[in-house]
Amino acid sequence: MNQDQEEEKPTCYDLLKVKHDLNKYNENIIRQLKMSHAPIDACEIFLFLLEKWCTTGGR
């Protein structure tokens, strides 16, 4: 496969930075989820899956 044509994929560091940025807003998101009566676990599940995906190399 030609590396020039290969799509650039996010690195584990990129994903952990995203997770860190999301965690900064997590409290506010959870507050909004409580007010909207959405399942409170939605954000936590997303962050867990993001971390799991990163630690398993995207598998």
UniProtKB/Swiss-Prot annotation:
Protein name: Uncharacterized protein ORF59a
Superkingdom: Viruses
Species this protein is from: Acidianus two-tailed virus (ATV)
